[in-house]
C-alpha cells in the first residue's frame, strides 16, 4: 500500500519497498529496514486481543497479573467460545477519560444514579431486598481493578434467573448452573453464575459481566472528551431464545435507549463541569480506606487505578492527595 502524503510504498508486512526520489535518502541507504513501519506488539488471552505501543513491555500474562483469574471466571461460563454479538454502539462523553475509568468499577453510585432502573426491575417482580448486594472491590495491580457482588438482582443469562427473563428460560438457566457445578464444583459455579463482575483492565478496557455481558473500550479525544465503543458478547452455543434474552437484558441498561448509559453520561459530564473550577483541588477517594475487608461499594479499586496513573506520570505516592482529576 502507498502513503497518500509522500508516496512511500509498503508491503503487507510493513516493509518499505518503494521510495520516490531515492537518491535524496542515500545517507540512509536504499529502503533500509529502519524506515519500515514499526511492528506493534500484540497478544491474545482467552480470545481477547491486546496491543501495546510501548517499545518495551512485559508479556501479556505478566501485565494482566491477577486480572487473568477474573477473565477466566468470565470466559468459563460456557464450554463454547465467547463471541461478539453483531452490532455495538459508539458514543462520546464530554468528560475526561479517567472519569469513565473510575465509573466502570464504582458500585457506590448504583442506588442513586440508577434509581429509576431499580424501580423498573421492581415493577417486573424483582424483590427490592435483592438490590442490597454484598461483595468486594479489589485493586489487582498494574492499575487493574474489580468489583464483584451478589445476589445479581438483575439476573444473569448464565445462570441466575430473574423476572427480567422469560419464564420459559427457567429450566435451561437451571441446567446451565448444574453443568457449571459438574465442571467446577459448587463454590466456583456460584462465583461464575451468582455474582456480577465489572473488571477494569488499565488503562481503557472494561468487561461488564452483569445482566448482559458487554465489553467497553474508550479513548480520549480531548482533555474533556472521551470516545466510547461498547460491544455485547455471548457464547456460541446459545439458543435463539437465550440470545434474545441476553440482548434484551443488555439493552435495558446499556446504550442510548437503556436506563444506565444516559444516567452515567449525564453524571460524568456534570462532574467534568464541576472539576473545571480552579478552587476544586482534588477528588475524594477515601471511602473504605480503614476497614481490612474491602466492600464492593468502597473505593480501593479506584485508588489502585490512581496509584498506577500516578506512577506512570512519575509522581510520588503522597502527591495523590493533591491530584485534580480533571487534569
Q: What spans do the regions from the language model cover?
A:
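C-terminal catalytic domain of Rieske-type non-heme iron oxygenases
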Residues: 40-327
